[in-house]
């Protein structure tokens, strides 16, 4: 990022950056700068950092002040000082050392570059899956790797004249004997002439192939091939069908990749580097610790490795005229491996380690992962109006509500509470209002509840992998220090109530509050955005709770005395007929569900205890052919007919006086919850119409 780019961000207040491939011209524009005397600087040619005697940056090194700017504002490498921003007609740079008199903060964004002696493929586009280079070229990744790392050569298909290798009948890739025999019989100049005409190897071959691609033709041919494969239909051979399916998936990825390159105006050959950018020094610092020892970023050592190997290759190509071509190819391979290690250490096998057997941190290690530049430094910062706490289950909450601890709520909504105290003339100024909040006066909690009633909050659980990872809730005050959450929203957050933590955010602007209410409320996100299946479904403890609530007798769900299909109970009835003769009489009778629940709360009956509940049952539902299991006469002349799941009380004249169903308190609780839910749904539908 150069100064113009940085100022552009500040001027237009851009809130986003795009990471992608750039052209060599763009890299040169970012890194090169023209001094007032007309000299162009920016290329890093030496692998040195600081001079061991003067402790000053080496010229044209990784910390050069001519390239990256002065270490101290307005002070050049010679020690001269100029006032920054002085409009006198004085030179803006030191004529002796060539350092500009500018602010030292320029070292945070001024980049340099390394001019590579040979093209180098970007390992992210070659080795990361899916391989973009392999997809565009429609070639196996293994063969491309062998070509990049000079394991074999490639007959140049773009030669206008008949080449020796083509006349020999070679097609695309050379046999192993040619790999070793060709370079040995040519000096550097002769080998270059031969290679430029006959063969191509290394990243240069990849660059030529990518430069010859026509993305529009790739789109047309890939789409046509996909249609032809789709029209063929299944062959009946499972192996062939799988092969066709994989080919169709590959064609889809290739089309999408080509469309992306066209849409973003990126040329495929930019995936092969000719100029390697050098990070600003402040992003890869060398610091001095106690005892005079220096600590350096691992990236500096990886840059030094690249420069050493690149300079060696440059010397082989320019000065040593008798060097065998095989040595040149080996050195090109070493440069490629050094750049690979700089970008992604360990992607090709064993990572590079230092003298203490510690793996060097490459670019990928610096920016990716939880401790990377993006998640820790840019996205992981603490923000205002936010909090964090452990989540616990709140079964009594509504789906769109969450319990917010008082300590967190008073901190998050403190400004709103202060405004409420002043508006209601309960505090004369902000200081008095804060004093009332610190003393936790009762009026504060009342105003806090009033503020929270109309203000949603956002709950977020990291990592936020999809949109259900952050949802809106209506907060209510709860005791304790944990956030209470409805168990049905657990799956959307992928959370468990075993110590997971969640962050709380307060939307401040009206737009954010409207978005939270219209799009992000939990009761409006009941379906999975990926597959459309219900995501708020009972699981684990809820299913076990429903089982216990409705199972009845703890001996099992089939342990019903009046179940005629339970053979064990039928035998027990024969054995203990006298003992259980009046057992149903001992089971309590209730006129309504409120009396039954009241008896349970008074601990007169248990949750699974069977009872008789008076019920308005349609007589048409009673099967006329069903015979009663038992019958008993009451003391008042009534007659009780006991069926499988209900009881009919008749008068002497056989008239039905009342009907009771045999149930438990657990069934009553479940029925009431379902009834309330249905009534609420019907009321919402009627209000909507």
Swiss-Prot record:
Per the UniProt entry, what are the Gene Ontology biological process annotations, in alphabetical order? DNA-templated transcription
Coarsely, its chief localization is: plastid
Q: Which cofactor does it need?
A: Mg(2+); Zn(2+)
EC assignment: the record states 2.7.7.6
Output the Gene Ontology cellular-component terms: chloroplast; DNA-directed RNA polymerase complex; mitochondrion
Specify the superkingdom: Eukaryota
Q: Where is the signal peptide?
A: none
Q: Which InterPro entries match?
A: DNA-dir_RpoC_beta_prime, RNA_pol_asu, RNA_pol_N, RNA_pol_Rpb1_1, RNA_pol_Rpb1_3_sf, RNA_pol_Rpb1_clamp_domain, RNApol_RpoC1
Provide the top EC class: transferase
Q: Which reaction does it catalyse?
A: RNA(n) + a ribonucleoside 5'-triphosphate = RNA(n+1) + diphosphate
Q: How is the cofactor bound?
A: Binds 1 Mg(2+) ion per subunit.
Residues binding Mg(2+) are 496, 498, 500
Which UniProt keywords are present, listed alphabetically? Chloroplast, DNA-directed RNA polymerase, Magnesium, Metal-binding, Nucleotidyltransferase, Plastid, Transcription, Transferase, Zinc
Query: What functional role does this protein have?
Result: DNA-dependent RNA polymerase catalyzes the transcription of DNA into RNA using the four ribonucleoside triphosphates as substrates.
Which PANTHER family does the UniProt entry name for this protein?
DNA-DIRECTED RNA POLYMERASE (PTHR19376), DNA-DIRECTED RNA POLYMERASE SUBUNIT BETA (PTHR19376:SF54)
Indicate what this protein is called per its UniProt record: DNA-directed RNA polymerase subunit beta'
User: Which organism is this protein's natural source?
Assistant: Populus trichocarpa (Western balsam poplar)
């Amino acid at each position: 990022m150069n100064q113009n780019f940085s100022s552009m961000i500040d001027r237009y207040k851009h809130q986003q950056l795009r990471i992608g491939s750039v052209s060599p011209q763009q890299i040169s524009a970012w890194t090169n700068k023209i001094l007032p005397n007309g000299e162009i600087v920016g290329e890093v040619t030496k692998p040195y950092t600081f001079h061991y005697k003067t402790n000053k940056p080496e010229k044209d090194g990784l910390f050069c002040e001519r390239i990256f700017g002065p270490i101290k504002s307005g002070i050049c490498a010679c020690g001269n000082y100029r006032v920054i921003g002085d409009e006198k007609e004085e030179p803006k740079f030191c004529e002796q050392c060539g350092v500009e008199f500018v602010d030292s903060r320029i070292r945070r964004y001024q980049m340099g570059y390394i001019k590579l002696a040979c093209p180098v493929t970007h390992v992210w586009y070659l080795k990361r899956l899916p391989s973009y280079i392999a997809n565009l070229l429609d070639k196996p990744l293994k063969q491309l790797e062998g070509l990049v790392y000079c394991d074999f050569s490639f007959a140049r298909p773009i030669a206008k004249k008949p080449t020796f290798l083509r006349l020999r009948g070679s097609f695309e890739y050379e046999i192993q004997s040619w790999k070793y025999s060709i370079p040995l019989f040519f000096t550097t100049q002769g080998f270059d002439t031969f290679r430029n005409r006959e063969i191509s190897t290394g990243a240069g071959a990849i660059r030529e192939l990518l430069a010859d691609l026509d993305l529009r033709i790739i789109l047309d041919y890939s789409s046509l091939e996909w249609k032809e494969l789709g029209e063929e239909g299944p062959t009946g051979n499972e192996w062939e069908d799988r092969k066709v399916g994989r080919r169709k998936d590959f064609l889809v990825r290739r089309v999408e990749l080509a469309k992306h390159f066209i849409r973003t105006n990126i040329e495929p050959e930019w995936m092969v580097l000719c100029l390697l950018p050098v990070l600003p020094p402040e992003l890869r610092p060398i610091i001095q610790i106690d005892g005079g020892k220096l600590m350096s970023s691992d990236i500096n050592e990886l840059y030094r490795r690249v420069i050493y190997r690149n300079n060696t290759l440059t010397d082989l190509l320019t000065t040593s005229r008798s060097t065998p071509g095989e040595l040149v190819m080996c050195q090109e391979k070493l440069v490629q491996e050094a750049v690979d290690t700089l970008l992604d250490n360990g992607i090709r096998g064993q990572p590079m380690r230092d003298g203490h057997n510690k793996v060097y941190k490459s670019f990928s290690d610096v920016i990716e992962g939880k401790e990377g530049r993006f998640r820790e430094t840019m996205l992981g910062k603490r923000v205002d109006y936010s909090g964090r706490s452990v989540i616990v289950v709140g079964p009594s909450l509504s789906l769109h509500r969450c319990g917010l601890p008082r300590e967190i709520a008073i901190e998050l909504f403190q400004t709103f509470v202060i405004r409420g105290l002043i508006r209601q003339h309960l505090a004369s100024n902000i200081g008095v209002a804060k004093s009332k909040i610190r003393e936790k006066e009762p009026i504060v909690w009342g105003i806090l509840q009033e503020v929270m009633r109309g203000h949603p909050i956002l709950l977020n659980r990291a990592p936020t992998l999809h949109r259900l990872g952050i949802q809106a809730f209506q907060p209510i005050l709860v005791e304790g220090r944990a956030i209470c959450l409805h168990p049905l929203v657990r799956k959307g957050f992928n959370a468990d109530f075993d110590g997971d933590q969640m962050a709380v955010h307060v939307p401040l602007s009206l737009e954010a509050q409207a978005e939270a209410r219209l799009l992000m409320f939990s009761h409006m996100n009941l379906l999975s955005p990926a597959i459309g299946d219900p995501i708020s479904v009972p699981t684990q403890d809820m299913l076990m709770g429903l089982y216990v609530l409705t199972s009845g007798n703890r001996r099992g769900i089939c342990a019903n005395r009046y179940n005629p299909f339970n053979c064990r109970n039928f035998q027990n009835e024969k054995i203990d007929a006298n003992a259980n003769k009046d057992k149903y009489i001992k089971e309590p009778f209730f006129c309504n569900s409120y009396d039954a629940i009241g008896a349970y709360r008074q601990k007169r009956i248990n949750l699974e205890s069977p009872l008789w509940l008076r019920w308005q049952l349609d007589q048409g539902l009673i099967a006329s052919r069903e015979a009663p299991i038992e019958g008993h006469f009451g003391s008042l002349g009534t007659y009780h007919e006991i069926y499988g799941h209900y009881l009919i009380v008749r008068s002497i004249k056989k008239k039905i006086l009342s009907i009771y169903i045999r149930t438990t308190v657990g069934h009553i609780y479940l029925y009431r919850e379902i009834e309330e839910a249905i009534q609420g749904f019907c009321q919402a539908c009627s209000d909507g119409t």
